[in-house]
Amino acid sequence: MSTMREMYPKNGRVILHVDMNCFFASVEIAHDPSLQGKPLAVAGNEKERKGIIITCSYEAREYGIRTTMPLWEAKRLCPQLVVRRPNFTLYREASFQMFQVLSRFTEKIQPVSIDEGYLDITDCYALGSPLEIAKMIQQALLTELQLPCSIGIAPNLFLAKTASDMKKPLGITVLRKRDIPEMIWPLSVEAMHGIGEKTAEKLNEIHIHTIEQLAKGDEHIIRAKIGKHGIDLQKRAKGTDDREVDPSQMGQHKSVGNSMTFSKDMDEEKELLDMLERLSKSVSKRLQKRTLVSYNIQIMIKYHDRRTVTRSKQLKNAIWEERDIFQAASRLWKQHWDGDSVRLLGVTATEIEWKTESVKQLDLFSFEEDAKKEPLLAVIDQINDKYGTPILQRGSQLLRKQEKSFQQKLENKFM
């Protein structure tokens, strides 16, 4: 054991990032082994040929098929493409089983999405070397769940995440700080985890195009352009990341959101606002189901030319109802939509906490209003859920129901 202990750093940490390969498609293959080796896509209604590719297998990617591609285009590239409708119940169960497997190796696990998570194995030397543990995890997921994954091994979260992206599928990559100048610095800033399109544009404006330039850039200029987040990114570009694996996030929620990618560009404001309301309702239901509230509402607008705008509104009081979420989202929409056609729309509730722990700053009138309407809203939701259609609606909702239902329009247009 003492020899194995020498395989671990004396002062630093050993972090694994486990990232499942083509997760939804892999779960479908595990559920139906006859799909093995076939070009497979998880997408919308294949009969209507109007669905969007959510994910696809590596066999499908060899034909040029990619995420968000319209299904008709994917079928044109690969006529023999096998299509499955998304089964999120199946995916959630597979995710649960995946984290159950990971928990056999260490209790220090932090999920970051349905199909990826970090493990701190610094104290796991009794199980073997870091590379041996990674191989055991990969093999366990593959043999027990028939789910492939890639794993990054590094001294911190950022480098572990970066390493797991380097070899797919079924890759295991070790990334040390001494590897950064050769393996990371030559890459463009757009390739760096944590840098989106807008941040990359801001960095480009101050003549930072590569990760090396970010690492060696003037801290004051970077802070002035991007703020504290820019300094955090610069530290990571140098290989420094002080974040720790947080096991308390097992079961916690950072955000609750929904988005819709359209099969064609949309520019009619009424239809886009209808979609925004639909997404707000979905977010509200998920918050209420988990007894959560939000102090910040965010919208994302992705235009036809791939420009992406993300804006948020900080709230004085916690909210969870559809009406309040839609009100905040629609205000953001009216302030930031430039009138151009839209390809994707999203609504996300952030700054989440348990409803029982939230402290709402109420005056007498708002307290009475909330106290009166909360039981009624619960009954309305229960009745509507029971019958599957909006039997009961508020007056404001009825004014928007003069045309056929949004669900019908959605299915006719996009599914």
From Swiss-Prot:
Poorly processive, error-prone DNA polymerase involved in untargeted mutagenesis. Copies undamaged DNA at stalled replication forks, which arise in vivo from mismatched or misaligned primer ends. These misaligned primers can be extended by PolIV. Exhibits no 3'-5' exonuclease (proofreading) activity. May be involved in translesional synthesis, in conjunction with the beta clamp from PolIII. It is found in: Cytoplasm. It catalyses: DNA(n) + a 2'-deoxyribonucleoside 5'-triphosphate = DNA(n+1) + diphosphate. HAMAP family: DNApol_IV. InterPro entries: DNA/RNA_pol_sf (IPR043502), DNA_pol_Y-fam_lit_finger_sf (IPR036775), DNA_pol_Y-fam_little_finger (IPR017961), DNA_polymerase-Y (IPR050116), DNApol_IV (IPR022880), PolY_HhH_motif (IPR024728), Rev_trsase/Diguanyl_cyclase (IPR043128), UmuC (IPR001126). Mg(2+) binds at D19, D115. This is DNA polymerase IV. The active site is at E116. Belongs to the DNA polymerase type-Y family. Residues 235-260 are annotated as: Disordered. It is an enzyme of class 2 (transferase). GO terms for biological process: DNA-templated DNA replication; error-prone translesion synthesis; SOS response. Its EC number is 2.7.7.7. The lineage of its organism: Bacteria, Bacillati, Bacillota, Bacilli, Bacillales. GO terms for cellular component: cytoplasm. Monomer. Residues 15-196 form the UmuC domain. Residues 249-260 have a biased composition (Polar residues). Residues 235-246 have a biased composition (Basic and acidic residues). NCBIfam families: PRK01810.1, PRK02406.1. GO terms for molecular function: damaged DNA binding; DNA-directed DNA polymerase activity; magnesium ion binding. It comes from the Bacteria. The record marks F24 as: Substrate discrimination.
